[in-house]
Amino acid sequence: MPDQWWIRYDGGPKFSLRLGLTSFKHVGVFPEQAANWDYIFRQTSDVAAKTGSRPKVLNLFAYTGAASLAAKCAGADVTHLDSVRQVVTWAHENQDRSGLRDIRWVVEDAMKFAGREARRGNLYQGIILDPPAYGHGPDGEKWKLDECLFDMMKTVGKILAPENSFLVLNLYSNGFSAILGETVVRQALGLPADSSLESGELVLRDRFGKNLPLSIFVRLKR
């Protein structure tokens, strides 16, 4: 088995991803996320069509960048942030192999960056979050999902444009259900009852038709 290899995603967006064996037991992609990639591509395209401008999309905890590439394929100005320089470099390779360019790369703690953007009054038409259950920022900042998620979402609510915008939250922690994730987003952002909010599970289906649930998602469309 090779140490590294490339695959091509040809769903709504079309891009290339380098896969490889790593010391942290990942291969560079979580394939169940394809449903989110297609959603991000569609929503970014819709916002661009409605506004006649390039949507600003922020991808937090962005890993190797498939969601960033999906937004970029739809014409967004993308900011890709992760606290691990190694995976940001990996994401940059994926951008180059995909024939894309001009993604903004940031190695920083997500909470710090989002808070600074809020203080500056910067707004994004798309925000994507895929936070881990536990983690550390580049300067030793500690992240624990069940303690930090609500505050993170409150801050994100301050930088998400009030109209013609979307949000995608993905959660892998076993302590969160789709209903709980949706409740956190609704309360943190102060959303009315009739908000266009959806949640559910992302699964992989085997050749026998059995579903393997792997994560939950919460999506908001404005």
Question: What spans do the regions from the language model cover?
Answer:
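Non-catalytic substrate-recognition/targeting regions of SAM-dependent transferases
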Residues: 1-31, 38
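Conserved class I S-adenosyl-L-methionine
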Residues: 52-63
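Conserved SAM-binding loop of SAM-dependent methyltransferases across substrates and taxa
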Residues: 64-76
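Conserved SAM-binding motif I beta-strand of class I
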Residues: 77-82
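S-adenosyl-L-methionine
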Residues: 84-128
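Mobile active-site "lid"/loop adjacent to the S-adenosyl-L-methionine
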Residues: 86-87, 107, 124-155
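Helix-to-beta-strand junctions that scaffold the AdoMet/dcAdoMet cofactor pocket
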Residues: 160-162
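C-terminal catalytic and target-recognition region of SAM-dependent MTase-like enzymes
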Residues: 164-222
